[in-house]
């Protein structure tokens, strides 16, 4: 009975539950039917892309949308306030003579995105601050007021994605149009000034890519490009279309400790403003640029054993390179492993082929460091694009671009500079061995740049010119103590100098020293940043007593004659004379050595380059006039910070340059010029430039004689200039063509300076200082010196320059001499030339009255 009652209860409950389930199911079905009948609400995000042809690139980073020639970023809100880097590079061009593929924006932009009201704003972090220690809340508040982050650009918010995890905004103005934020077009091309005017209406977006840490936007931009030489327009504006790749990359929150710069080291750097502690003054701090190399086995490294780095520097080699190029490229890159082995790193650098099976590999992804092959008409030397975290100086990635016509460049250099000595290069093309040797040389130097090293143009000046003609010396020491010098081949070696090395040997002692300073590992758990700095500073103190281990900063090239690009040896006059002998041999044999060149195109390019090289030699020697040697050394080293070039060498250099200019056309091969298609002889053109160069040297002499009154003075400069240029007047004879051109240049400059000084009350020498200022007074830097500072002392040119007085005195003497000369029996052309000079002098004197 009891069992029956229990069963009855269960039956009742079961029925009730069943009824409830049926009712719920019915309601749910009704709700489903209702939801199906009601359309889903369309969001702003949906409408933004609805019925539009959209190209989308997705990744963990930023999703990029391209539609209607516009670019939209879909930025995860988790990336707001995360620092990023904006850069640009040239990827193609319609005019390789003006624009070089691989050229990059000079200053990548550090920024972050933030939301302000209804806009996304692009802010630049005030990353000049570097806090060495924990600061107080009050100091932090004061810093926040005085070092705010600036807003560079704003973008209207178009929508949020459907789960509101990302914001969508239009970045076409930033990444789809030419922008002043990151200008990629050149402003100089050799001696020519370049002006590029963007044509926004002719801008087109070619493609987009998105990776885990960066995005790429590829564009075609059209510019109106014009050239000028010394402010004189050369031709009209010409349309030039360039491929421009913009990249936005996430800056990693690197844990690498910065290395405090020493200005005596030739390494690139990032600048910060140090805030040491409350109550102390700010100070400028510089971090060297370097890869984060940490030994895999720290204990073995500490014992002096060769150790693999935990993360070696890996470069991916483009598989489109000609097969014969790949080995010299590898050798050029891996040459630097010799320097890393000296400081305990084994296989610090690797070169591997483009992966065939790694699905996520893309050479356009800037997190991969690649060596790219660029099919281009440009015969430029390789260039590199380096991405640095400015917060620490860590090099995150670097890529090299090698142009398909680099063989032409190497052939030109090798034939012109060594053809007089080396019969094996006297042909239309270099042999495979000579080309491989040259390619390795170029790659080695550019790899140095990708490791953070700067050019060291003064290195070769530490070798005597005579030593460069010595077989034993050049075999052992090479052509310079650094591959970072601008030395191609040994152009001073003569045909009688048997066994002399003609090409660089590889890394020099300076390169080993610089890699040691920049990449020596310090265990951050045991060595503080200050102890590291002090150890390295003492290391440099000891090494730079040897001039061959010094860094000669390019920023001082305006004054220091050792820093003239292309110079070889310590005696510029001797080197120039030897080089000119070799160039004459090559020039006279071009028709014999270069075959199968019916249109003379190859020979004309070589002939033009020889004339340009001769002009470069002239400028190298002229750099002694008004020059000073600038030495970045501690006072305790007892080496003067600046030392004016001796009076004897300045005067000898000026007289050499005057004679060279007046007789420069003797080098011209008129028979060759008549056979070809040369519209104007470069030798004729160069003479005009030489006149301006000679006149400009007076300003440098004004400064150096002010600094050292016992050196070559402006009066002595003008006396030598006058007595040499107007010797034909004193001898009452017709001037040579060279004399006539230089006399006109002198008269033009004299008229400008004297008339300006008397007619307008100003100084013909200009105003202000001709020196770079010493920099902000921000206190002492943690490392030795300031790597951004020009070493030349500051001098107000108006105190030193007396050009108008000396020009005026010269004109007085010249007027008397011309009046006497015109009484002689002169050819009509000479008489007309002298009469015109006398007329101009009298006009100037009228102003004086």
What are these regions (language model features)?
Residues 2-15:
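Bacterial N-terminal signal peptides that target proteins for export
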Residues 80, 324-348:
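Zn2+-dependent metallopeptidase catalytic core
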Residues 459-849:
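Conserved catalytic/binding loops enriched for acidic/polar residues
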Residues 353-374, 437-494:
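The catalytic-center signature of Zn2+-dependent metalloproteases
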Residues 334-345, 444, 448-449, 489, ...:
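Sec-exported extracytoplasmic/periplasmic mature domains
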Residues 14-24:
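Bacterial N-terminal signal peptides
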Residues 33-321, 339, 343, 354-407, ...:
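Auxiliary tRNA-acceptor-end handling modules of aminoacyl-tRNA synthetases
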Residues 28-30:
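Boundary at the C-terminal end of the N-terminal hydrophobic targeting segment
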